[in-house]
């Protein structure tokens, strides 16, 4: 007896039904896993809302510091629930402040132009601020308070055309300081940037990348006082920056500084924490007040750096002389 052939349409319908059945099973398994996960999360949430005897209640969402990302909050809650140290001590003890999250870190770099006699006075002409992850938070050209004498394009990358869309210094200063206040600021030779901004940042919240080689125990060639960001990037990050003859890019420099900081972030923050515990009253010198180191960068012409230091000393001597003359002329 010859078997009867099955119509092709029937085979197609069988295959279609088989595929649909497999998809349904796959979706059912996914749905089961989803429901099981949902039930587990709901159970954990209910346990955290009503702590048992001896268990520490988790902080409510309103207690979470502003600026923390939602994903970070979920991770922190999961760690808190799964941690082994869930018992509260009978006697309350002071707790250390939690380590700052990535949102508390920014990197900055500024480019200056020359104003005043022979262009020896450095004023801010561009400022860039990037986040911990390298996102550009701020990047604007800034019009100095005095007329520009020397654009220093070879180093600053600033040209006359950039000033057409520049904003006044006072406006830029307010915008930038709003980003910096309360943050840990990363940068290279930050005393230059803070000097240009006419701003003093707390020393405990400064991470100057000129200190990075010391934390990595690098050769003396990288630990000299005037080590450049370009050399650090090449030797530690294996990347080339500040190439060509069009000047620096403040965005690139700020990103590079943040990458250098992240190389030694753990060691650096441990050192900062241990120093704060050992000497809570000693916050260290503030780099923004170090006038003698202003313009101390190998990319600036040596005569320009020397003249700047000379002008600073002359201004200090002149101020001291005026104060002494005022004291002598004051009535008894």
Curated annotation (Swiss-Prot):
- InterPro entries according to UniProt: Exonuclease_RNaseT/DNA_pol3, REXO1/3/4-like, RNaseH-like_sf, RNaseH_sf
Q: Which cysteines are joined by disulfide bonds?
A: none
Name the predominant localization.
nucleus
Cellular-component GO terms for this entry: nuclear membrane; nucleolus; nucleoplasm; nucleus
The sequence motif named Nucleolar localization signal is recorded at 21-29
Which Pfam families is this protein grouped with?
RNase_T (PF00929)
Query: Gene3D superfamilies from the entry?
Result: Ribonuclease H-like superfamily/Ribonuclease H
- Regions of compositional bias (Basic and acidic residues) in chain numbering: 310-321
List the GO molecular function terms: DNA exonuclease activity; exonuclease activity; nucleic acid binding
Q: Motif Nuclear localization signal: where?
A: 160-183
Q: Which UniProt keywords apply?
A: Apoptosis, DNA damage, Exonuclease, Hydrolase, Nuclease, Nucleus
Q: Subcellular location, in the record's words?
A: Nucleus; Nucleus, Nucleolus
- In which domain of life is the source organism classified? Eukaryota
Annotated ranges, domain Exonuclease: 105-261
A Gene Ontology annotation in the biological process aspect, one of them, is: intrinsic apoptotic signaling pathway in response to DNA damage by p53 class mediator
- Locate the compositionally biased regions of type Polar residues: 63-73
- EC no. given is 3.1.-.-
Task: Extract the ranges annotated as region (Disordered).
Answer: 1-102, 272-332
PANTHER family the UniProt entry points to? APOPTOSIS-ENHANCING NUCLEASE, RNA EXONUCLEASE REXO1 / RECO3 FAMILY MEMBER-RELATED
Please describe what this protein does: Exonuclease with activity against single- and double-stranded DNA and RNA. Mediates p53-induced apoptosis. When induced by p53 following DNA damage, digests double-stranded DNA to form single-stranded DNA and amplifies DNA damage signals, leading to enhancement of apoptosis.
**Protein name, entry field:** Apoptosis-enhancing nuclease
Gene behind this protein: Aen
């Amino acid at each position: 007896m010859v078997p009867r052939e099955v119509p092709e349409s029937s085979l197609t319908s069988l295959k279609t039904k088989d595929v649909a059945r497999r998809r349904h099973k796959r979706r059912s398994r996914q749905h089961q896993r989803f429901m099981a996960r949902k039930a587990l999360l709901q159970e954990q949430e209910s346990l955290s809302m009503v702590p048992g005897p001896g268990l520490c209640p988790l902080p409510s969402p309103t207690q979470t510091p502003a600026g923390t990302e939602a994903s970070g909050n979920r991770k922190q809650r999961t760690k808190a629930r799964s941690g082994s140290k869930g018992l509260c001590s009978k006697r309350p003890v002071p707790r250390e402040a939690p380590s700052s999250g990535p949102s508390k870190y920014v990197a900055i770099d500024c480019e200056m132009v020359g104003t005043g006699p022979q262009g020896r006075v450095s004023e801010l002409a561009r400022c860039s601020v990037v986040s911990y992850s390298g996102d550009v938070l701020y990047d604007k050209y800034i019009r100095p308070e005095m007329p520009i004498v020397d654009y220093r394009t070879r180093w600053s990358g600033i040209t006359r055309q950039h000033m057409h869309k520049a904003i006044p210094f006072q406006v830029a200063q307010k915008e930038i300081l709003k980003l910096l206040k309360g943050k840990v600021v990363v940068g290279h030779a930050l005393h230059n940037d803070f000097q240009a901004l006419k701003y003093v940042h707390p020393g405990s919240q400064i991470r100057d990348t000129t200190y990075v080689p010391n934390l990595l125990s690098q050769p003396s060639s990288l630990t000299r006082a005037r080590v450049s960001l370009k050399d650090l990037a090449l030797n530690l990050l294996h990347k080339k920056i500040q190439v060509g003859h069009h000047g620096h890019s403040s965005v690139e420099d700020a990103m590079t500084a943040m990458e250098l900081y992240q190389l030694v972030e753990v060691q650096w923050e441990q050192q900062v924490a241990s120093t704060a515990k050992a000497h809570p009253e000693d916050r260290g010198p503030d780099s923004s007040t170090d006038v003698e180191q202003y313009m101390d960068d190998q990319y600036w012409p040596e005569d320009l750096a020397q003249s700047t230091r000379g002008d600073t000393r002359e201004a200090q001597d002149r101020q001291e002389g005026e104060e002494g003359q005022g004291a002598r002329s004051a009535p008894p």
